[in-house]
């Protein structure tokens, strides 16, 4: 078990299940959530929330501030679309946001990064 878990997409279906499982195991969990996320109150009270966006570098800097080799990042943030031509926001979040999270993981030398995708 790691000292700390950073979870993106923590209020989504998969992300919330991951967060709840970690909390049940007694883990220290930090969740990156959008400032206007209507589901933030559904997270367990033990979860430390950090307001931010995977597409905004400054908010990731705050989220990763204390990350190190004893940290596990679980990246669940993403947008699912069934449109034949997905919009630019989908690309920004799913590709750009994932790249930004991965870059922070490499810069901080985190112990493990788990990428969850529903695509």
For every predicted segment, state its role.
Residues 38, 48-96, 104:
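NAD(P)H-binding glycine-rich loop region in Rossmannoid oxidoreductase-like domains
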Residues 96-119:
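Conserved Rossmann-fold NAD(P)-dependent oxidoreductase catalytic core, especially the SDR/UDP-sugar
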Residues 8, 32, 73-77, 113-119:
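SDR active-site strand-loop-helix element
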Residues 27-37:
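Conserved glycine-rich Rossmann-like NAD(P)H-binding loop of the short-chain dehydrogenase/reductase
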Residues 3, 47, 71, 111:
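Conserved acidic residues
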Residues 4, 28-30, 111-113:
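Residues at the starts of beta-strands that form the adenosine-phosphate
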Residues 2-25:
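N-terminal Rossmann NAD(P)H-binding glycine-rich loop of SDR-like oxidoreductase domains
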């Amino acid at each position: 078990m790691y000292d700390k878990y950073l979870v993106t997409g923590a209020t989504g279906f998969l992300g919330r299940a991951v967060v709840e499982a970690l909390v049940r195991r007694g883990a220290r969990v930090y969740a990156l959530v959008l400032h206007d996320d209507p589901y933030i109150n559904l997270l367990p009270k033990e979860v430390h929330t950090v307001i931010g966006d995977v597409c905004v570098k400054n908010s990731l800097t705050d989220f990763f501030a204390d990350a190190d080799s004893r940290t596990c990042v679980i990246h669940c943030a993403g947008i699912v679309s069934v449109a034949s031509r997905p919009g630019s926001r989908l690309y920004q979040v799913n590709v750009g946001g994932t790249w930004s999270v991965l870059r922070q993981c490499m810069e901080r030398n985190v112990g493990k990064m788990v990428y969850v995708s529903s695509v």
